[in-house]
């Protein structure tokens, strides 16, 4: 009976699946301060990896949201929420009465939006490079082969070789790479803030209605960019 009541209260407080909150319930000032703190820490610890910003404030976040194609309402009203897929909330107790609450959730589609934005950037950038290289090949063929009947065959062969070149794979470099890493720092901080809000709500329910206090909290992530490894994208894994 206690578990059923706890589950009902949590379900009423934290949206799941595609659902988000009917209204914005977070403190934007607290949110922006948290994102800024996380961002500036990465700037300090790993100089040159991401774009230096004086401050991450509400104006900065609004521009970020608009750029990647998310509405302000959905961005803020998704905090806190669980999402779908393999995300879950779980509470269990040991035989001696100790309780453990687990929240497994993420950035609520923000990571996918950021990824898609920069994939489009990569494709656009690499397409421009490929076109420039191809035009150079065409000019070299025409200049080096007097037999015009061979031009089409030679150009097609050269085009195929270009397609097989490794550098024609979609990738980010320079300013675009820093832009992607910068956005991912914000996305990871967003996901962490979502966890904080969920734990805050659940902790309040446990304390107020069941007289249970939270003694320790552990936070870990398994989909993230590890800047300590130059950097490394860890998908479904943590650092050993």
In which residue ranges do the predicted regions lie?
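Hydrophobic residues embedded in beta-strands of well-ordered beta-sheets
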Residues: 98-100
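Glycine-rich, flexible loop motifs
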Residues: 1-96, 112-240
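Gly/Ser/Thr-rich loops at beta-strand to alpha-helix junctions
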Residues: 107-109
């Amino acid at each position: 009976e206690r578990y059923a009541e706890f589950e009902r209260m949590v379900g009423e407080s934290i949206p799941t699946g595609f659902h988000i909150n009917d209204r914005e319930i977070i403190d934007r000032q607290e949110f922006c301060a948290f994102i800024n703190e996380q961002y500036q820490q990465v700037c300090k610890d790993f100089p040159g990896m991401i774009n230096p910003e004086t401050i991450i404030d509400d104006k900065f976040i609004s521009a970020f949201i608009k750029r990647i194609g998310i509405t302000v309402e959905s961005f803020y009203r998704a905090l806190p929420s669980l999402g779908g897929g393999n995300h879950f909330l779980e509470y269990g107790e040991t035989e001696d009465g100790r309780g453990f609450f687990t929240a497994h959730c993420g950035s609520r589609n923000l990571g996918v939006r950021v990824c898609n934005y920069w994939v489009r950037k990569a494709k656009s950038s690499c397409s421009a490079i490929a076109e420039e290289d191809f035009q150079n090949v065409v000019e070299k063929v025409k200049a080096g082969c007097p037999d015009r009947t061979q031009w089409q065959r030679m150009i097609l062969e050269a085009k195929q070789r270009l397609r097989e070149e490794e550098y024609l794979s979609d990738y980010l470099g320079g300013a675009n790479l820093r832009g992607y890493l910068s956005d991912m720092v914000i996305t990871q901080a967003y996901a962490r803030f979502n966890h904080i809000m969920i734990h805050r709500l659940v902790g309040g329910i446990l304390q107020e209605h069941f007289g249970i206090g939270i003694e320790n909290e552990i936070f870990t992530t398994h989909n993230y960019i590890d800047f300590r490894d130059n950097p490394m994208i860890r998908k479904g894994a943590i650092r050993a």
